[in-house]
Amino acid sequence: MWHLVCGDNAVAGVTQSIGEAAAATGLRVLRDDLAVGPLTDVDTPPCAARVAFWQAAWPASVQPAPDFASGLPADARWLAALAEQAQPVTVWHGDSASEQLLLARVAHALEHSALALWEVPCGSGDSRVKTRKAVAMHAPEALAALAQPREVSASRRQALAAQWRAVLADHGLIHRWQAGDFSGEDYQRIDADLLRYARDEAQPLARLMAEAMAHNDGFFVTDTFVLWRARELAAAGALVLSGEPGQYGYMGLQVRLG
């Protein structure tokens, strides 16, 4: 059995739930945050647009940077070959848009396969900031207690695969998951949040980022992504950044309106 999770933070809990032996042979981590950036070529190696997005978004001061040019196409090839092998697949997911997109992506990869697809829902079903839960947000003991695998029905598989096709075609740069469906948008709403919470006086960039991260339902806004948007706004003259990047690429930075 393959067990697929979105991001390294989910590994400890899922490992405790399925056991170390099963994790050693079947746990695979897909690290791409599918909720942000262009998805048009994410399934088509060499995934040039997807790679270019992450290479631009990754803070230069945080090294070593992931090898996006090899890792993202490798994920695409692995998923494309998933239907060719014999092991059934389980996707662990919560209320993260990225986790839900992974589930839809896997359903699409297995759309014409008789291979069994299972899911372990770990969320609340509500993607609002105050109620949402990603897999990694559960303590390992709690995750093991709530994990109830269930096979994905044929009709649900078809619906998920159709959602994935729609996401690839909508050219959205951000995808929110709300009420069981995805909606695509550009970066304007996130950028507007950053400008709304910025002031004429300098403040820690970390504080501004936290404000934007705390007021966005539908997807988990990561520090990597919102830092990139702040850098882009600074390059356009809308924000002014000062100081040295420091830890995580932003802890030493101050920000004010441009």
Describe each region flagged by the PLM:
Residues M1, T25, Q85-P88, L115:
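Short coil/turn segments at beta-strand junctions that form active-site/ligand-binding loops
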Residues P59-A104:
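Long, hydrophobic/aromatic-enriched structural stretches that serve as scaffold segments
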Residues A12-S17, L39-T40, E99-V106, R128-T131:
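A short acidic (Asp/Glu
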Residues M1-S70:
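A structured, charge-rich N-terminal accessory region that forms the first stable segment of a protein
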Residues H171-G258:
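C-terminal, charge/polar-rich interaction regions
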Residues G26-A35, L115-S127, D223-F225, S242-P245:
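A generic structural motif
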Residues A22-G26, R105-L117:
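A short alpha->loop->secondary-structure connector
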Residues T131-Q203:
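A conserved mid-domain beta-alpha-beta active-site/ligand-binding segment of alpha/beta enzyme cores
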